[in-house]
Design a protein with these regions (language model features):
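Secreted/periplasmic carbohydrate-active enzymes, especially glycoside hydrolases
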Residues: 1-208
Length: 208
């Protein structure tokens, strides 16, 4: 048994309501000595006229005492679960270090993420060693084009857009810091209804 305890008695006051205690999920992660680093899959997008390039970056943590060769597989699924592209790369991860690789995948006729249609793809990353999967990760990905111009301002997917935002602390008032998802659903619906399209999350991490 593993017990996690939080003691906030030494610093129980603040300029804002902290919520104290554990208000986010707690996970115990058991991983293979060769595994995807925590938050180790990221991506960048480059939108063209009728296509987009999705650059997937993967960090592999090798806790073994020797260099090892691994295979990294990336598959991109659309919202309906159809594979739109995939790729494989073999590289060597150094002993007791984090090594990274990049893979570029072309997406034809991509559905772009926008405020009114937040379309998301899913990147499934698998790491194999000697033909066996040693780790797997799923990452939601939105393909969009962001541009900033000193004269024209901000544009999303080449469409001018005014950023109309609010600042929200991590708590939900009398409901505490462990905010139920239903509260966020109501908040976001209300904010969008008054024209809000951006949120600054402060100051602490939000509850999951």
């Amino acid at each position: 048994m593993i017990a996690v305890r939080v003691d906030h008695s030494q610093d129980a006051d603040s300029r804002w309501y902290t919520g104290s205690g554990i208000y986010r999920d707690v996970y115990l992660v058991y991983a293979n000595p060769v595994h995807i680093n925590l938050w180790g899959v990221s991506y960048e997008t480059k939108v063209k006229r009728n296509s987009a390039v999705l650059t997937v970056k993967t960090e592999i943590d090798n806790n073994a005492d020797k260099n090892l060769d691994v295979e990294v597989f990336n598959r991109v699924f659309d919202r309906e679960g159809k594979i739109v592209n995939q790729g494989k790369q073999t590289f060597r991860v150094m002993a007791d270090k984090v090594s990274g690789c990049e893979m570029q995948l072309d997406i034809q006729s991509p559905k772009l993420w926008s405020i009114d249609n937040p379309y998301l793809y899913t990147i499934v990353t698998e790491v194999k060693r000697n033909g066996k999967i040693v780790d797997k990760s799923e990452t939601r990905a939105g393909i969009r084009k962001l541009t900033f111009d000193a004269d024209k301002g901000f544009a999303l997917n080449d469409q001018p857009m005014k950023i109309k935002g609010v600042c929200i602390h991590h708590d939900a008032g009398c409901l505490g810091a462990a905010v139920p998802k239903e509260v966020w659903q109501r908040r976001l619906k209300s904010l969008k209804g008054i024209g809000c399209n951006a949120i600054r999350m402060s100051h602490n991490p939000q509850a999951t």
